[in-house]
Amino acid sequence: MLDYCLVVTGPAYGTQQASSAYQFAQALLAKGHRLSSVFFYREGVLNANQLTAPAGDEFDLVRGWVQLARQHGIELNVCVAAALRRGVTDEQEAAQQGLPAANLQPGFILSGLGSLAEAALSSDRLVQF
């Protein structure tokens, strides 16, 4: 059994990166491996935007990540600098930056690159999408 860390750099919609990462995560968990952390970086931070509203016949990837994380104890870390540049923030950062609202999907955590470094060091495999 291997411990994995995923890095997602593509948005929830518009490219295949995030969807492929989600499917990969499901597959490795089904095979008995462990997924300790998913780090969302660059455009990948858009996976944490709770204001996405996919069509009724589309898979809701944002909420899919949260459900997967709850079921398997996975940390969903979002790069705070990349998130703020792209308009994704939690209540605390919104207040610090003087922004009118927050939109970070509950279940995701704003964090720095240090959390990615820690996850990379403690996992057996790091896979980037």
UniProtKB/Swiss-Prot annotation:
GO molecular function: sulfur carrier activity; sulfurtransferase activity
Enzyme kind, highest EC tier: transferase
Main location: cytoplasm
One Pfam family linked to the record: DsrE
Compartments, as annotated in UniProt: Cytoplasm
Keywords annotated in UniProt: Cytoplasm, Transferase, tRNA processing
Highest taxon in the source lineage: Bacteria
Keyword Transferase: yes
BP term (GO), one: tRNA wobble position uridine thiolation
Sequence similarity: Belongs to the DsrE/TusD family.
Protein name: Sulfurtransferase TusD
InterPro entries recorded: DsrEFH-like, Sulphur_relay_DsrE/F-like, Sulphur_relay_TusD/DsrE
